[in-house]
């Protein structure tokens, strides 16, 4: 293994319960419930029309600009106190000590990624940031971002390991031929992460050496020989 590829939201830090509560409150203010099952379909994806779902429930059009502004204000306030998930800084330190490459592979916009890795105190040491910048054709669960990350780092799929918290992210890594460690949070722990090669419930006390040993010992191997990566042309990405 030469490189580790990390999802951001829900993996390196965990804003998911807060974001779910914010949207749930909006639904409740309009007389409806945003169920956990409906929210599970949103996690790790982009382009899902939550306001469209709310309009269907209420039977009327909503001022989406007002709703977006309300959600943005609450996110600005409530996410400001969050830091990296416990154990994440230590795992990144172990990654650097082992001489491994690392990149962020996230569906969030680059500006969001930069802001919150800085807030979490983990902004240093990344070789690159990979974001679809709102393009659903490049976003997880498609393998595009992972193939882009592999090409940028110059590593083959079997030389990388991904860390993800959601089914969408795990599927994206799997489709790119990258072995995956599932590190679910409270919002994703009950979801189907069975495509992952390894599951850990917490980063606290995690030894990278042990994780990599268990990954290498898994009888399931990435079936991508790298040809898909070679055939997949990628645009320039944003590098820290």
Where are these regions (language model features)?
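Helix N-cap/coil-helix junction residues
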Residues: 32-34, 60, 122, 154-155
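Metal-dependent phosphoesterase signature
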Residues: 33, 53-93, 98-100
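Conserved phosphate-coupling serine/threonine residues in phosphotransfer and NTP-handling enzymes
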Residues: 11, 106-108
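Asp-based, Mg2+/Mn2+-dependent phosphohydrolase catalytic module
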Residues: 1-2, 93-96, 100, 110, ...
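Conserved SAM-binding loop
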Residues: 12, 84, 162-163
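Active-site neighborhood of HAD-like aspartate-dependent phosphohydrolases
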Residues: 1-40
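Helix-loop "lid/cap" segments that line or gate small-molecule binding pockets
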Residues: 24-27, 46-61, 116, 149-150
